[in-house]
Regions:
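Periplasmic-binding protein-like
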Residues: 48, 125-132, 198, 202-243, ...
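Ligand-binding clefts/hinges and TM-proximal coupling segments of bilobed small-molecule sensing domains
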Residues: 22-34, 156-174, 213-215, 244-267
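A ligand-binding cleft/hinge motif common to bilobed small-molecule-binding domains
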Residues: 107-115, 162-163, 185-188, 192-221
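Extracytoplasmic small-molecule ligand-binding "clamshell" domains
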Residues: 29-106
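C-terminal motif of bacterial Sec signal peptides marking the signal peptidase cleavage site
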Residues: 16-19
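Ligand-binding cleft/hinge of the Venus flytrap
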Residues: 56, 70-79, 157-176, 205-209
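Acidic, polar ligand-binding/catalytic clefts
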Residues: 71, 80-143, 213, 218
Length: 267
């Protein structure tokens, strides 16, 4: 009788432990899927100092045009967007390693990057421009002769500057982790000019009136796209479908108007 009781106790204990194990396994699956009702979580790598595409507001919330676009696209895909601030210099490494699912933050489409990353169709135009202070003696690109110029490290600003004849005459080119640091050094006089995305400086010229000015001419005409890991055509297809739907239903236009005052999204 005692042996029977003990055997039954072991049987019950085994079932309980098995049930706990199953629940633990289910929990791991739900962590991978996350989101409401088991929807997938998409991890998006961003530069959180790249206004107005993705940056921190005065309450430290991550906001911006790309943030809103990515959030809406994830919803259209039945997923939730999780934003992961990354070192922009290592963005392709973060993507290829699987630590992020997408690069989405004013990410310029280039031939070099297309060898490493899958891209969506372009969704926004941009130019690489030269920026100085309003009272600077640098009035034209040719005036950069003998000057010190700042760029964001491993951004498309560097190659754009290198493609221009003035590159050989510039005294120093200083690289920065982000555009905020470069513009800060410009304001303090450690730089004579900064090369950066026109969409970025347009924002700062609005929020800091009377400080910066753009020189005439563009060093490079660019297009932004969303980067997807090579080999993940399935995710690329779903994302592009979501973006196309947003263009058709007016979501993209609404987000663009909120951030730029007009619909600038490419179709």
């Amino acid at each position: 009788m005692k042996k029977t009781t003990i055997a039954l106790l072991f049987a019950v204990l085994f079932l309980v432990l098995t049930g706990c194990s199953d629940k633990s396994s289910d929990g791991e699956k739900s962590t991978a899927d996350t989101g409401k009702e088991g929807t997938k979580e998409i991890i998006i790598g961003v530069d959180d100092k790249f206004a107005p595409m993705g940056f921190r507001d005065d309450k430290n919330n991550l906001v911006g045009f790309d943030i809103d676009m990515a959030t809406a696209a994830a919803e259209h895909m039945g997923a939730t967007a999780k934003f992961q601030p990354i070192d922009w210099k290592t963005k392709e490494t973060e993507l290829s390693s699987g630590r992020i699912d997408l690069i989405w933050n004013g990410y310029t489409i280039t031939k070099e990057r297309q060898e490493k990353v899958l891209f969506t169709k372009p969704y926004l135009d941009n130019n690489q421009v030269v920026v100085t202070l309003v009272d600077s003696d640098v009035k034209a690109i040719e005036d950069l002769d003998g000057k010190t110029v700042g760029v964001q490290a491993l951004s498309s600003a560097g190659p754009a500057l290198e493609s221009h004849p003035i590159h050989e005459k510039i005294k120093n080119i200083t690289e920065f982790a982000d555009n905020v640091l470069a513009l800060t050094d410009l304001k303090t006089g450690r730089l004579d000019a900064v090369v950066l995305d026109e969409v970025v400086i347009d924002y700062y010229m609005t929020t800091e009136e009377g400080v910066f000015t753009k020189l005439d001419g563009s060093l490079a005409v660019e297009e932004y796209g969303v980067g997807v890991k090579k080999g993940n055509e399935k995710l690329l297809e779903k994302l592009q479908k979501a973006l196309d739907t947003m263009n058709e239903d007016g979501t993209s236009a609404e987000i663009s108007t909120e951030w730029f005052g007009e619909d600038k999204v490419l179709r």
